[in-house]
């Protein structure tokens, strides 16, 4: 918020009126001044019709501003536009106010004006402040300080420390409201603008960040590293010290100025020793390294207390220093008062007033409002009253106490909500927070009152509070809720004896208060305010938890003695809520549920039936047997059943987001609330791509079932299914007129379809490999297609002719996108690059390098200025299309990023990943706004121990589960992997289990202890398969990095790397004698390796798609393979001849297994079946039906009597080989197992379907 300080202007106006009668009443900008006005407006990103100038100008002129758009007296939209046009002179007062709004000196921009050196007012370079004009600045949420008073001595001191004396760490200390933040921003601005600082002394990078919401130190370090490395560091260490070391590397190589504001937020409240808040201890390690390690950069902290451990590094001649800030001087304080209006006081009275409040700028602003509103600007009257002791001031909190006591009930409620929201909120958002319906007029009046008192601020984003005010109100909220809970049945602790007997006293108090009606406690904040908002932006909700909810729990523990007592109290509150109306109970039910969860109470079996439960955040929370029958669950957030998500698209108006995944579903979400609105079911295999029609009425999807489907966005009904492709369909795109749809397929063709009747209009041929993506040009005349043949083809849509083939990539071209202005085409490739093309000429204009893995998806922003890319390296990069540099790298996904999409307004980015999450990002700040997470316990690989005792299953929940398969009893889980587990194998002696994961590691586990004793880390991509050598001393692993590795399990040493496959290795098997190893690959081949020499001694080719598994028969004479071409093949591997092809599956075949005698073969398929085959005849004996999702694996028991199968329906099934009957179903408890949602309200049908899939009952 702009520091409101305009006394020079006010003095000038008064002097003009009463002294200098000859002053000109109108002013006009000179041509040079007009250019500066336009530049200043452009730097702020304001359009001519932007109304943010209105509020600021109103404040400066001292007239009332209104939210509803009514212009204040003397200020009109026409005057503002005439000022910007510069053709006519306008009212002098308005001219000066408008200049001040833009941070300009009116004397220098007026016609016939003068230019002079200025000290603290706007400078020629100040206009560009908070813009992107400096090539290496990132201001984050830094406030505008274009209006600034005094502090010249402090500025000079700190500037000297930074630029001349090479200080590494500087702490600006002072009480809340003293001006630390403003000084830090002004300092950075002056360093940029100063012509007296030599280039060698000036920082090359300046970054400003606020710690107000206590972000994890790892997140702050990631932001700093990305910025200082020019977005080149993508592989950040998961360890704190690794990130610190990487940051120090950048601080040594370049001169950097880092400013971290509000550092008191990471310190324990009320602790003058500067100890760190729980969870923020890593900041101490970070600051220690900055202080004691040699580098050429400077970190500036602003804080109310000095962080612990820094004092020992400080000294007048040492590179670590601190500067305590005191209040403003008298003259500076008087100028601040002038912003608020007219005040009458003698020099002595001014001195007394400013001295009494220590020159604290925030305190003076608040007091000025009181004097203006209650004493008509008469300082002497105020001083007379204050001498009676009603305005005692030792700390800013004292002043806020006095102000808070004088607020109306509605004003207090607004203050609480602004503290909870943590960032600016609009009037509509604030109104929606209230349980009661507050008329907009009353809300506006209260907001206006609070704004006049300087208790709240208004920015372009809405209403908020200064950090010191927000902290005060948050603490007040916590104290008030604690008091309310005591009134509801708890007693205050009074010494050790009472602490010991608290349980009995609590019980007694329950009896005493049991008869009290809920309304007897007035209107508790516990019911009127949500302690956290489940649907808030992710980073806001995390700060609500760490700064409101968790401190409240800590205080309750102090009050009540134990978590059990807290739990008892909350249960008692629930009983008092039941039977009351939503208006009476408000947010209490949701608050109880959130408190119980974050107090780590096991919620199993809790009764929330018949209650209003709003704003409960329940993603990832076990709710086994919880009763929500007949409850109102509005605004609650639950876990989703998302698979690996492959694509995302915004609707044309930006209100909806569609996603599709490997669960064969298309989902439609409401962006603002995060609600799941629709689940479109109909595809029979992975859904690869989704896109909205230009009018937003139709959703098109395509997938591995070779179909394209059209859905009604209104109700999720499938309108048409377009058939004709003979392979997976990877991409679809609507023509701009919405009448034609293009589809790209693995059958190497593109088809154009008529949307109305579903007929295929044209089939475009020319690519020699899978066509991965299609996109129409903005004018609809050209279609671009990209393929696995490394090329891009441009087609004339009307004639179906190939106009041009673009060749430059060296890998699959996975994505293409036209810029909105139609000037360029971008392409993303498996060669890890992005290329920008002039598609009219075929010239490659630029190649973007930075990703360390395949680029899967790209998208232009609506204004064509930014290109976004998503990659297999798990990052999202934003590229400036004018400078062609990476301006931001977004981290957070833990697996490959498959799809990226800009919202229509260009402000939000949607990204989806194989980590089963959808994330929305703020494009400007890089903050994650919202994330939807899937929770599915897929059973991926299964394996019997050779001793028949245990069945193991690997899951996408990152664990290996051990089962007593004969009884169906779950034994335990092996935890340690950080991603999906795709391969498991037992050692021949059953003592060791190996697991392979998409976290690129292989782990070896001791089955008896459940401990991991070896981690193998040399693969550079997902590890799909692991197998033990028959002698048990060596394992082989296969990876998406296209290599097979052989390992010594005792030492963890990699013995050999076999690397002749051209695509990922999906399956492996040893020959019974251990001499050969077979590897199955997505390159459609099986290779046979001599394990002693590492040479490839044979290749089996015959499948027409990815080969998922290859296994030797027990006698070693034949090999069986399976593929996504829906077949199983039997081979004479010595001759390289296919003996049989087993057909019958109607979808991909993922896994096969021989019975111990080699006579039977089992196969697992995406068609949800297991088939039992006679190896000799090739006939199918049994089709085992029961799974409700794809079957990913099969394994025979050592005695060959049963087969186990693992499925994405989250079950393992045991089948009788002779009969095909299902004998046993093994399933771990799902997240919401047994949760009763009978009669619930506030949830969409899609969400209810999801809850049922996770175990809920209805």
UniProtKB/Swiss-Prot annotation:
Biased composition (Basic and acidic residues): 112-128
InterPro entries, sorted: Cro/C1-type_HTH, G-protein_beta_WD-40_rep, NB-ARC, P-loop_NTPase, WD40/YVTN_repeat-like_dom_sf, WD40_repeat_CS, WD40_repeat_dom_sf, WD40_rpt
Keywords recorded for this protein, A-Z: Repeat, WD repeat
Residue windows of the WD repeats: 55-93, 640-679, 682-721, 724-763, 766-807, 809-849, 850-889, 892-931, 934-975, 976-1017, 1019-1059, 1060-1101, 1103-1143, 1144-1183, 1186-1227
Top-rank taxon, per record: Bacteria
Gene Ontology MF term list: ADP binding
Positions of the UniProt region annotated as Disordered: 112-138
Pfam families per record: Beta-prop_WDR3_1st, NB-ARC, WD40
Residue stretches spanning the membrane: none
Name of this chain's protein: Uncharacterized WD repeat-containing protein alr2800
Lineage of producing organism: Bacteria, Bacillati, Cyanobacteriota, Cyanophyceae, Nostocales
């Amino acid at each position: 918020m702009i520091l409101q300080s305009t006394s020079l202007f006010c003095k000038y106006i008064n002097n003009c009126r009463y002294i200098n009668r000859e002053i000109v009443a109108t002013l006009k900008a000179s041509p040079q001044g007009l250019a500066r006005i336009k530049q200043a407006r452009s730097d702020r990103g304001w359009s001519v019709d932007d109304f943010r100038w209105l509020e600021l100008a109103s404040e400066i002129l001292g007239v009332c501003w209104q939210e509803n758009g009514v212009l204040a007296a003397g200020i009109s939209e026409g005057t503002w536009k005439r000022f910007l046009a510069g053709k006519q002179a306008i009212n002098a007062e308005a001219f000066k106010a408008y200049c001040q709004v833009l941070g300009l000196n009116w004397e220098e921009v007026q016609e016939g004006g003068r230019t002079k050196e200025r000290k603290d007012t706007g400078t020629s370079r100040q206009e560009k402040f908070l813009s992107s004009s400096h090539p290496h600045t990132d201001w984050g949420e830094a406030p505008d300080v274009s209006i600034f008073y005094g502090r010249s001595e402090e500025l000079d001191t700190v500037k000297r420390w930074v630029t001349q004396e090479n200080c590494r760490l500087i702490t600006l200390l002072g009480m809340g409201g003293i001006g630390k933040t403003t000084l830090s921003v002004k300092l950075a601005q002056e360093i940029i603008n100063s012509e007296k600082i030599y280039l060698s002394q000036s920082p090359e990078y300046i970054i400003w960040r606020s710690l107000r919401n206590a972000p994890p130190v790892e997140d702050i370090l990631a932001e700093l590293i990305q910025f200082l490395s020019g977005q080149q560091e993508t592989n950040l260490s998961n360890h704190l010290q690794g990130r610190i070391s990487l940051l120090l590397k950048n601080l040594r190589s370049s001169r950097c100025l880092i400013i971290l504001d509000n550092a008191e937020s990471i310190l324990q409240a009320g602790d003058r020793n500067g100890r760190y808040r729980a969870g923020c201890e890593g900041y101490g390690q970070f600051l220690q390294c900055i202080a004691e390690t040699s580098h050429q950069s400077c970190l500036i902290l602003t804080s109310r207390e000095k962080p612990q451990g820094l004092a020992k590094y400080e000294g007048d001649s040492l590179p670590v220093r601190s500067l305590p800030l005191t209040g403003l001087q008298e003259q500076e304080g008087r100028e601040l008062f002038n912003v608020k209006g007219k005040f009458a006081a003698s020099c002595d009275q001014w001195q007394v007033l400013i001295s009494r409040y220590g020159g604290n700028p925030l305190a003076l602003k608040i007091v000025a409002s009181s004097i203006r509103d209650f004493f008509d600007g008469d300082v002497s009257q105020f001083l007379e009253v204050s001498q009676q002791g009603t305005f005692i001031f030792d700390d800013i909190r004292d002043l806020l106490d006095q102000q808070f006591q004088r607020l109306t009930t509605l004003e207090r409620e607004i203050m609480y909500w602004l503290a909870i929201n943590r960032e600016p909120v609009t009037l509509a958002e604030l109104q929606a927070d209230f349980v009661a319906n507050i008329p907009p007029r009353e809300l506006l009046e209260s907001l206006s009152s609070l704004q006049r008192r300087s208790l709240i601020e208004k920015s372009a984003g809405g209403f908020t509070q200064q950090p010191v005010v927000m902290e005060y109100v948050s603490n007040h909220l916590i104290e008030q809720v604690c008091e309310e809970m005591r009134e509801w049945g708890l007693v205050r602790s009074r010494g050790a004896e009472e602490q010991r007997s608290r349980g009995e006293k609590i019980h007694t108090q329950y009896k005493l208060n049991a008869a009290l009606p809920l309304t007897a406690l007035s209107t508790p904040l516990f019911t009127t305010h949500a302690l956290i908002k489940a649907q808030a932006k992710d980073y806001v909700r995390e700060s609500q938890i760490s700064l409101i909810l968790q401190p409240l729990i800590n205080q309750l523990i102090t009050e009540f003695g134990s978590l059990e007592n807290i739990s008892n109290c909350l249960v008692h509150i629930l009983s008092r809520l039941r039977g009351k109306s939503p208006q009476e109970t408000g947010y209490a039910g949701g608050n109880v549920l959130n408190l119980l969860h974050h107090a780590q109470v096991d919620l199993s079996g809790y009764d929330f039936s018949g209650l209003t439960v709003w704003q409960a955040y329940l993603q990832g929370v076990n709710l086994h047997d919880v009763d929500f029958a007949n409850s109102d669950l509005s605004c609650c957030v639950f876990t989703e059943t998302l698979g690996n998500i492959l694509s995302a698209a915004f609707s044309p108006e930006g209100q909806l987001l569609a996603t599709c995944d490997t669960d064969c579903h298309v989902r439609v979400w409401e962006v603002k609330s995060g609600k799941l609105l629709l689940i479109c079911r109909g595809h029979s295999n992975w859904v690869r791509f989704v896109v909205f029609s230009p009018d937003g009425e139709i959703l098109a999807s395509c997938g591995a079932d070779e179909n394209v489907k059209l859905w009604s966005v209104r109700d999720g009904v499938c309108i048409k299914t377009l058939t004709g492709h003979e392979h997976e369909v990877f991409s679809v795109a609507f023509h701009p007129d919405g009448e034609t749809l293009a589809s790209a397929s693995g059958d190497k063709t593109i088809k154009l379809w008529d949307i109305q009747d579903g007929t295929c209009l044209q089939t475009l041929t020319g690519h020699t490999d899978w066509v991965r993506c299609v996109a129409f040009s903005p004018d609809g005349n050209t279609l671009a297609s990209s393929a696995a043949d490394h090329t891009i083809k441009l087609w004339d849509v009307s004639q179906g002719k190939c106009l041009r083939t673009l060749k430059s990539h060296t890998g699959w071209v996975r994505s293409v996108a036209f810029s909105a202005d139609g000037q360029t085409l971008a392409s993303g490739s498996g060669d890890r690059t992005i290329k920008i093309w002039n598609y009219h000429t075929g010239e490659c204009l630029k190649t973007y390098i930075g990703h360390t893995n395949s680029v899967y998806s790209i998208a232009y922003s609506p204004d064509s200025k930014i290109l976004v890319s998503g990659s297999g390296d798990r990052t999202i990069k934003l590229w400036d299309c004018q400078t062609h540099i990476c301006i931001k790298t977004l981290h957070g996904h833990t697996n490959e990023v498959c799809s990226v999409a800009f919202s229509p307004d260009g402000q939000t980015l949607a990204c989806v990943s194989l980590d089963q999450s959808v994330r929305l990002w703020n494009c400007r700040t890089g903050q994650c706004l919202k994330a939807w997470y899937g929770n599915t316990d897929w059973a991926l690989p299964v394996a019997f121990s050779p001793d028949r005792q245990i069945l193991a299953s690997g899951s996408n929940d990152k664990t290996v589960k051990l089962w007593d398969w004969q009884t169906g009893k779950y034994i335990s889980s092996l935890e340690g992997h950080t991603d999906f587990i795709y391969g498991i194998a037992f050692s021949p002696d059953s003592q060791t289990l190996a697991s392979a994961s998409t976290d690129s590691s292989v782990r070896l586990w001791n089955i008896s202890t459940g401990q991991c004793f070896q981690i193998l880390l040399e693969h550079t991509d997902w590890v799909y398969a692991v197998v033990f050598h028959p002698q048990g001393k060596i394992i082989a692993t296969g990876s998406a990095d296209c290599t097979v590795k052989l390992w010594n399990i005792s030492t963890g040493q990699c013995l050999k790397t076999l690397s002749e496959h051209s695509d990922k290795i999906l399956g492996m098997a040893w020959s019974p004698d251990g001499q050969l190893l077979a590897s199955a690959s997505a390159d459609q081949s099986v290779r046979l390796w001599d394990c002693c020499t590492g040479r490839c001694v044979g290749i089996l080719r015959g499948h027409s798609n990815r080969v998922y598994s290859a296994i030797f028969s027990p006698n070693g004479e034949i090999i069986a393979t399976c593929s996504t071409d829906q077949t199983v093949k039997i081979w004479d591997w010595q001759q390289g001849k296919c003996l049989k092809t087993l057909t019958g599956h109607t979808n991909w075949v993922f896994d096969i297994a021989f019975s111990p005698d080699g006579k039977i073969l089992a196969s697992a398929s995406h068609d949800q079946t297991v088939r039992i085959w006679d190896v000799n005849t090739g006939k199918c004996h049994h089709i085992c039906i029961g799974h409700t999702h794809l079957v990913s694996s099969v394994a025979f028991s050592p005695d060959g009597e049963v087969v186990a199968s693992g499925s994405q329906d989250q079950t393992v099934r045991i089948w009788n080989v002779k009969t095909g009957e299902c004998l046993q179903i093994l399933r771990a408890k799902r997240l919401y197992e047994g949760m009763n949602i009978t009669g619930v309200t506030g949830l969409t049908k899609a969400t209810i379907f999801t809850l049922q899939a996770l175990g809920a009952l209805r």
